[in-house]
Amino acid sequence: MTVKKILSLFVLIFFSASGIVFSNEKVELTSLGNKDSKVIIKVFSSLTCPHCANFHKKIFKKLKQDFIDTNIVRYEHHGFPLDLAALNGEKILNCVQNGKKRIELLNEIYDKQDDWAGGSDINNINSNLSKIAKKHGLNNDRINNCLKDENIENEILNERIMAQKKYSIESTPTIFINEKKYDGKHSYNDFKKIIEKIL
C-alpha cells in the first residue's frame, strides 16, 4: 500500500469511527518569523514521524538560527498527523496561544519523540504528552479539555485533507519553499543554498 493510501485510510477510518462533522473553528498557525518575508518555508509533518523529528532537530534549528530569528525567513509548521497519537499532539500544541512558546513545545515534542510516542496505548501516550505540555504552561484541566475538543480535532483533520488535495503530499516531512516542493531527504546546506538563491 502506498503512503498516500495509508494517509487517506487513516482519515477515512477516523472520520467513520468518530462521526466527525466539520466546524468553523480555526486552528492557530504555528509559525515564526516575519509574515512579509521574501522566503516562506512550509513544513508538513507528523509529530510521530521519525524523519520529521530528524528534520526538526537537525535542519529546522539551524534554519531558525541563521534565517528565521533574523526575520529573513518565515517558517510555518503545518500539522499532518498520520495517527491518533500525532493528532492528539497537534491538539495539545494548539492549546499554547503564544507563538514562541508553542515552538518551544514543538521542539520538545520532537526532541523527546522516542520517549512519548512509544507508549503502550493511547492513554499512556497522552499521559507522556501531558508531562511535556505541563512544562510549557498547560495544566491538567487545560490539557484534558484540549484532548476532548472535537472542534479543534475536526479542523486539524480538515486542514490535513485540504493540504493533501492542494499539495499532493505523499510522505512526511514535505517542505515547501515559496510553494516549491522538497522532500525531507535534503540537507541543511541544500536548503541554505535554495534560500540564498532566492534572496
Task: Describe every region a protein language model picked out.
Residues 2-83, 87, 134, 154-167, ...:
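Extracytoplasmic thiol/disulfide redox context detector
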